[in-house]
């Protein structure tokens, strides 16, 4: 499942949120216009209009103590808009709290957090987020996370773990062949696997695998 599609998982809860006022732990006696602003932000988020949603969420975040779910929404918006540092700023603190949500909703936040750290080349921070996502996502969503984990370990020159994750990613891609450009991805993974095997074989060439993670 593509990241954009994955991010919509768990948003069925918004239907009930749209009819509610700002939660008690956000504020008391909220003015009506801010309730409307929250409703609009949620509607934009649900419609994948992340830029518009983020503008409204930021304004609310400046004025109220938003709950953990809304902060996670802000983090997801930032991730979708390539604002990776800000995404981590919002998502990192709420990760311990997302375990109370439905598994697939958790996977949305873990993936957005992991990808944000990955894009910032913070591979050690990305690894546990990808691993937690693997525990709660559907099987047909695991390939991308396994693929990224392969690169996380490769960049750390942990060839054995990189090899294991690349091989697992290839198996999942082959089984759930849904991804656009799958043939090119599989060819790349094959090259990465061969490169990692050369690194783990003392009798083989010292050539390193390519570090292109697209």
Cite the ranges covered by each PLM segment.
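Terminal, low-structured helical/coil segments at or just beyond the last alpha-helical repeat
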Residues: 168-214
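Alpha-helical segment of the N-proximal tetratricopeptide repeat
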Residues: 33-59
């Amino acid at each position: 499942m593509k990241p954009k599609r994955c991010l919509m998982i768990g948003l069925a809860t918004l239907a009930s949120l749209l009819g509610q006022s700002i939660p008690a732990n956000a504020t008391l006696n909220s003015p009506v216009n801010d309730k409307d602003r929250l409703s609009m932000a949620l509607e934009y988020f649900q419609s994948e209009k992340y830029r518009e949603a983020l503008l409204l969420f930021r304004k609310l975040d400046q004025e109220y103590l938003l709950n953990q779910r809304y902060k996670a929404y802000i983090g997801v918006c930032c991730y979708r808009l390539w604002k990776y540092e800000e995404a981590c700023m919002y998502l990192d603190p709420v990760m311990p709290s997302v375990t109370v949500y439905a598994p697939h909703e958790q996977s949305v936040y873990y993936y957005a957090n992991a990808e944000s750290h990955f894009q910032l080349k913070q591979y050690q921070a990305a690894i546990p987020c990808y691993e937690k996502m693997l525990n709660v996502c559907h099987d047909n969503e695991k390939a991308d996370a396994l693929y990224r984990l392969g690169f996380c370990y490769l960049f750390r020159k942990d060839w054995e773990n990189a090899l294991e994750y690349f091989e697992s990613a290839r198996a999942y891609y082959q089984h759930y062949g849904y991804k656009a450009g799958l043939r090119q991805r599989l060819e790349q993974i094959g090259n990465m696997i061969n490169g990692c095997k050369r690194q783990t074989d003392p009798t083989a060439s010292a050539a390193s695998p390519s570090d292109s993670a697209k």
